[in-house]
């Protein structure tokens, strides 16, 4: 990839999404252990096909040191004290960062962000689905690499509400 050409592999590890084949049985295990009936199919396809278990965008980490299973996703949710409240709302945690935690609505596929200061009624929609979220996060990371944060926010202003923009602005440090 041109953008990361010449960088030390230790730096690029975890910021380049690479193909991985994780068995479908991991989705069934995830659903069973988290007590969820349905998991958005687009999200399922992405997490079975790529190395989300060792990947992040900017300050947001999906998984860490787990490229062969979905244990990172199971543990992230089960270790969260308020997971039962999330499960009742069909939500799971898919990434953590500062200051937001990223949630997936298991049925609709919508992506939300919330902070420890928010109630679950105040969560903010940041993307209509996982693919849109990933594309926006990747674009944000590229904008930071190219010092084009303001241009990134200008493009996001055409797509997102003011409450969503707060997340995207904080992601690229534009206030």
Per-segment meaning from a language model:
Residues 113-146:
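Compact, glycine/acidic-enriched structural inserts
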Residues 1-102, 163-175:
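A surface-exposed partner-binding patch
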Residues 57, 127, 135-136, 156-160:
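Extended hydrophobic/aromatic-rich secondary-structure runs
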Residues 19, 32, 119-122, 157-160:
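Generic alpha-helical structural element
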Residues 142-175:
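Acidic, proline/glycine-rich low-complexity IDRs
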Residues 105-108:
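Short acidic-glycine loop/turn motifs at beta-strand connectors
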Residues 31, 131-134, 157, 169:
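Residue-level detector of alpha-helical secondary structure
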């Amino acid at each position: 990839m041109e953008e990361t050409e010449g960088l030390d592999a230790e730096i690029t590890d975890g910021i380049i999404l690479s193909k991985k084949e994780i068995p479908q049985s991991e989705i069934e295990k995830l659903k069973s252990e988290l007590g969820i009936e349905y998991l958005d199919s687009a999200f399922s396809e992405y997490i079975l096909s790529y190395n989300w278990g060792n990947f992040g965008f900017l300050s947001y980490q999906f998984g860490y040191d787990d490229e062969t299973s979905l244990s990172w996703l199971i543990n992230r949710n089960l270790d969260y004290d308020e997971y039962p409240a999330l499960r009742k709302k069909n939500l799971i945690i898919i990434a953590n960062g500062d200051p937001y935690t990223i949630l997936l609505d298991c049925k609709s596929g919508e992506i939300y962000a919330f902070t420890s200061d928010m109630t679950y009624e105040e969560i903010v929609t940041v993307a209509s689905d996982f693919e849109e979220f990933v594309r926006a996060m990747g674009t944000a990371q590229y904008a930071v690499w190219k010092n084009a944060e303001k241009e990134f926010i200008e493009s996001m202003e055409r797509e997102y509400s003011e409450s969503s923009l707060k997340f995207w602005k904080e992601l690229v440090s534009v206030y």
